[in-house]
A protein has these predicted regions:
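Carbohydrate-active enzyme catalytic cores, enriched for enzymes
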Residues: 1-101, 157-161
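Extended, loop-rich substrate-binding clefts of extracytoplasmic carbohydrate-active enzymes
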Residues: 52-66, 135-181
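Catalytic core of carbohydrate-active enzymes
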Residues: 68-154
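Hydrophobic residues positioned within well-ordered beta-strands of beta-sheet architectures
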Residues: 92, 162, 175, 186-187
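Residue-level recognition of well-ordered beta-strand positions that form the cores
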Residues: 95, 165-167, 187-190
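C-terminal catalytic subdomain
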Residues: 101, 181-189
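Acidic (Asp/Glu-rich), glycine- and aromatic
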Residues: 113-116, 187-191
């Protein structure tokens, strides 16, 4: 294989080879075969912005000194259990014109009220895909576990866009973000 022939000597070459092989193996689906939900465009950036990737934490950021946009897509944490995590894969946060347009509600409340805790960590309390998915009720033994959401997977991330997916109760949802002339468009795709 061409990549193996190009990068076969040093440890650094081996790491580069692995990176290229991973990129080649990433499959980007033909999204026109999926149901599409297009969200209202958001005017975010009035000037240039930088990108920041925190892959291990699963956060991808576009920002300048006044404006901010991010998406959560990554590992659940605690060896896949989720622990204190929420159902926030593919959820966004957005700050522009001195206002939060979309904001993660945070931990909400640590309480012995399981129903309230589950509400604060649900899809409905985050700015993620609005999927019509009915999760089973989780009891006090499930409060510190994410049973119905997978790790998020980023397929592409660059200055003007993002494409990633996560599975929610067995349903795969892709989220595509494009930024053009400071305007963010978000599209969700599922079968």
């Amino acid at each position: 294989n061409l990549i193996e022939n190009l990068y076969k000597d040093s440890r650094e070459d081996s790491e580069i080879k692995e990176k290229f092989n991973n990129e080649i193996k990433s499959e980007i689906p033909i999204l026109t075969e999926y149901k599409e939900v297009t969200h209202r465009p958001i005017e975010v950036f009035s000037k240039d912005y930088q990108t920041y990737c925190f892959k291990d934490f699963g956060i991808y950021i576009w920002r300048n000194e006044d404006e901010y946009f991010s998406i959560r897509c990554g590992l659940l944490g605690q060896n896949g259990v989720g622990g204190h995590s929420h159902y926030d894969q593919l959820a966004i946060e957005c700050f522009t014109n001195r206002n939060w347009i979309a904001r993660d509600p945070g931990t909400g409340t640590y309480t012995d009220n399981t129903e309230l805790r589950n509400k604060f960590r649900s899809l409905g309390y985050h700015w993620g895909p609005r999927a019509d998915i009915k999760f089973p009720n989780e009891d006090e033994f499930d409060c510190f576990r994410l049973n119905y959401m997978s790790d998020g997977e980023v397929l592409t991330y660059y200055k003007n866009g993002f494409l990633g997916y996560a599975d929610f109760y067995g349903k795969r949802i892709y989220r595509k973000i494009e930024i053009e002339n400071g305007i963010v468009t978000i599209e969700d795709y599922s079968k």
